Curated annotation (Swiss-Prot):
One GO MF term: ATP binding
Top-level division of the source organism's lineage: Archaea
Keywords: ATP-binding, Nucleotide-binding
Organism from which the protein derives: Pyrococcus horikoshii (strain ATCC 700860 / DSM 12428 / JCM 9974 / NBRC 100139 / OT-3)
Name of this protein: UPF0200 protein PH1008
């Protein structure tokens, strides 16, 4: 089973990924694939550098590029464990790459939705090097994400978690959905 996590930056994908990890399920981050690629190419992991790398790999490999970069890792995990979570899918082309490559596996899309102002505050507190520092940077990043087709992927979701609540309430929602998904595996 392949579980694709989709959500705008700061929506809570990382918390959902932690819930799967606590159950011993491996998680691969699409964002890490871009950060690793930036490192390989000697490009700084700044918002501009990561944007450049993400656009460059898509130019070189097509719109499903980031999925293509992660497929070898996913293949190995599926062989060993039979289940993997892929955090940060952004485009319908990436979904298609996973479905094409793993046509014998069940592929589930789990979307996490959270309001923009809430996400902006979370990202400011998180403070990762590629996180936006200003509201305009945040809006630019959202525009880029939406340009990749993240909204389309969210509309294809098999499950949706709305993260507009307290942390504890969000944790309860996560546990409920994760349990439901895993009840169908293997």
């Amino acid at each position: 089973m392949i579980i694709l996590l989709v959500g705008m930056p700061g929506s809570g994908k990382g918390e959902v990924a932690k819930a799967f990890r606590r159950r011993g399920i491996p998680v691969i981050s699409m964002g890490d694939a871009i950060r690793e690629e930036a490192e390989k190419r000697g490009i700084p992991k700044t918002p501009e550098g990561l944007k450049y790398v993400s656009l460059k790999v898509r130019e070189e490999l097509g719109p499903g590029a980031v999925a293509i970069l992660t497929i070898p890792k996913v293949r190995g995990i599926i062989k060993r464990k039979g289940i993997v979570v892929i955090e940060g899918v952004r485009s319908p082309a990436e979904v298609q790459e996973f479905r094409r490559e793993f046509k014998n596996e069940r592929v589930i899309i789990l979307a996490i939705h959270s309001p923009p102002k809430v996400r902006f505050e979370r990202l400011r507190r998180r403070g990762r090097s590629d996180d936006p520092k200003t509201w305009n940077e945040f809006l630019d990043r959202d525009k880029k994400e939406l340009g990749f087709g993240i909204g389309e992927v969210m509309s294809l979701a098999d499950y949706v978690i709305l993260n507009n609540c307290t942390f504890n309430e969000f944790q309860r929602k996560i546990e409920k959905v994760v349990s439901k998904i895993l009840s169908n595996w293997p």
